[in-house]
């Protein structure tokens, strides 16, 4: 009888053990299938169906909730979510989780370190963009600068060629004038001034005295030749329009376009031009002869002084040599 009671008691204990194991397994399976959030597991409480933190803290990521709980706390997170709409809650929780994650990795700087790093990257990209734009501007301006330099060089070369051609033609004209018995424009009161090629384009002031010169047209200069301009009615228009300032009288021989073209007092103007030209040539010839005579006299005086000095030096040397020989 006692043995039967002992066996029955052992069976009851085993049955209780089996029931306890089954209950533990059941509770484990029930908790796993229900998907309790990491917040509820961390707080060791039952996860309700309307848990506000369940969508953002899954059960398999307990470290995520620990970081948020350490930085903000459960009550602070719940208060933040209660003030937001349903559409804003995911974005707010994303920022909270990110801040707690960065603070866990960088306890000193936190999100400020990430922000400064991003700002440095933006600044570096902007500086690189500025450098690229400056290089592009430099490369784009190089052909333009080269073209401007070539244009300036061509312009200076053209001016130099025009000046050399003008000087050469002026020398040819001077030689031809001397051959023809004409003189240059010499003024005793002023220095010898050569009339520039574009003098007809420059205005003559009222105080400046007009200088009479034997001029020639631009077309004749371009043809590298010279021929005295004919003072007739056909070429008078070109002479008056191109060399109006040379004769010093701008309002006297103006071309009249009011009545369909033509000249006013053509015969009188041509006659006056001829007389003025003859008088200018005669005065120039006289001045040239006077200058040449003056230069010749100066050269003769200089040669005479040099000869006298040379003779004086010879006499001095002879006397010195004669004295030395006498003493010896």
Curated annotation (Swiss-Prot):
Organism the protein comes from: Arabidopsis thaliana
This protein's GO CC annotations: nucleus
Superkingdom to which the source organism belongs: Eukaryota
Protein name: LOB domain-containing protein 27
Stored Pfam families: LOB
InterPro entries named in the record: LOB
Limits of the LOB domain: 35-136
High-level lineage: Eukaryota, Viridiplantae, Streptophyta, Embryophyta, Tracheophyta
Family: Belongs to the LOB domain-containing protein family.
């Amino acid at each position: 009888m006692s043995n039967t009671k002992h066996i029955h008691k052992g069976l009851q204990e085993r049955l209780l053990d089996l029931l306890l194991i089954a209950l533990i397994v059941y509770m484990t399976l029930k908790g796993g299938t229900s998907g309790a959030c990491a917040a509820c597991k961390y707080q060791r409480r039952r996860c309700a169906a309307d848990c506000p933190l369940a969508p953002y803290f899954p059960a398999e990521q307990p470290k995520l909730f620990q970081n948020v709980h350490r930085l903000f706390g459960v009550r602070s997170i719940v208060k933040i979510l209660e003030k937001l709409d349903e559409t804003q809650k995911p974005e707010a929780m994303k920022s909270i989780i990110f801040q707690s994650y960065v603070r866990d990795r960088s306890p000193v700087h936190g999100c400020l370190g990430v922000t400064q790093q991003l700002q440095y990257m933006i600044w570096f990209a902007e500086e690189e963009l500025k450098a690229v734009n400056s290089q592009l501007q430099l490369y784009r301006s190089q052909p333009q600068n080269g073209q401007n330099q070539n244009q300036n060089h061509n312009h200076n070369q053209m001016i130099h060629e025009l000046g050399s051609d003008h000087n050469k033609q002026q020398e040819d004209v001077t030689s031809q004038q001397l051959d023809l018995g004409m003189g240059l424009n010499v003024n005793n009161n002023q220095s010898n001034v050569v009339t520039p090629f574009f003098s007809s384009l420059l205005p003559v002031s009222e105080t400046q005295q007009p200088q009479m010169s034997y001029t020639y047209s631009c077309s004749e200069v371009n043809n590298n030749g010279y021929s005295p301009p004919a003072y007739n009615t056909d070429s008078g228009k070109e002479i008056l329009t191109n060399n109006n300032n040379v004769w010093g009288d701008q309002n006297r021989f103006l071309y009249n376009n009011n009545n369909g073209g033509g000249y006013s007092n053509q015969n009188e103007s041509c006659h006056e031009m001829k007389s003025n030209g003859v008088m200018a040539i005669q005065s120039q010839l006289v001045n040239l002869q006077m200058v040449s005579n003056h230069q010749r006299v100066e050269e003769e005086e200089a040669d005479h002084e040099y000869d006298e000095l040379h003779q004086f030096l010879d006499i001095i040397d002879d006397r010195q040599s004669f004295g030395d020989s006498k003493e010896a």
